[in-house]
Amino acid sequence: MVFSTGNGDDNSKGLERVIVITSGKGGVGKTTTTANLGMSIARLGYRVALIDADIGLRNLDLLLGLENRVLYTAMDIVEGQCRLDQALIRDKRWKNLALLAISKNRQKYNVTRKNMQNLIDSVKELGFQFVLIDCPAGIDVGFINAIASAQEAVIVTTPEITAIRDADRVAGLLEANGIYNVKLLVNRVRPDMIQKNDMMSVRDVQEMLGIPLLGAIPEDTSVIISTNKGEPLVLNKKLTLSGIAFENAARRLIGKQDYFIDLTSPQKGMFQKLQEFFLGEE
C-alpha cells in the first residue's frame, strides 16, 4: 500500500519528516495538537501518518473519530499478528492521512525502543512525507521509546509554571537524545487573563524556555465539542480562533514562514490584537 496522493513530488524518499509531539506534563492538549496539526498538514496536500505512542492510554483515535475502525494496533504488528498495512487506518475524509493506533490493554514496557524504530521505518517506507508521533506524558521509558526515531519535536505547554517546568525538562532530554530541531506551541492562552497579569504571556513562556515559537492557541470551549464529535477543530465549517491558530501553526511547521502574523502592520485587526495579547505587546 503506497499513499501516492498528496502534495509535493513522489521522489521524497529519504526526505520524510518524523516529528514527535510531546509535553512532559499530561493534560496540556498534546493529543489535540497532534490531531489538528496532522489533519491540517494533510489538507495542505501532504501524506501524513499519525502514530499514537501512548500505550494503554490511547486517545488519538477518539479525537479523529476513528475508534470504531481500529482492528489491529502497533502491538499486533510487533507481535507478528498482522501487517502494517492492515493496522493503518486511512481517514475517509482525507485519504492522504492515516492513523496507527496503539494498544489500550498493554503496558509501555511491552514495546522496546527498537520496536518503535522499526515501526517508524516501516511507516516511512510507505511514502508518507510527515510522520507525527503522539508521545505519552512523562519522561520515562514510554517517552524514550516514542522519540527514538524522531528528528524534530514540538513541545506543547500551557502558560502555567508547572507545565513550563516540565516542558523545560523535556527540552533538555530531547537535546540529550540528539533532537535539536525543537519548536514550542503554547496552548490554552487566555488574552483576558494576560491583560490582567493573571497569566504569563506567550512571550514570557518563550523567553523562559528559549525555544522557537511555532504557535499560540487560544482557550476554546469548542475543543470539548470537537473531541466528543471525533472531528478536529480544523474541520469545522466555521473555524474558531483556535482552529485558525492550529492551521497557521501547521503551515509554519511545513516551512510556510509567511504565515507569521505581522506585528509591524499599522492596522490593528483582530489577529494583530490577539498577537498583542499573546505576546504581551502594548
UniProtKB/Swiss-Prot annotation:
InterPro entries per record: CobQ/CobB/MinD/ParA_Nub-bd_dom, MinD, MinD_FleN, P-loop_NTPase, ParA/MinD_ATPase
Location within or outside the cell: Plastid, Chloroplast
Pfam families per UniProt: CbiA
Protein's GO biological process: cell division; negative regulation of cell division
Transmembrane segment boundaries: none
Similarity-based family: Belongs to the ParA family. MinD subfamily.
Annotated function: ATPase required for the correct placement of the division site.
Identification of the protein by name: Putative septum site-determining protein MinD
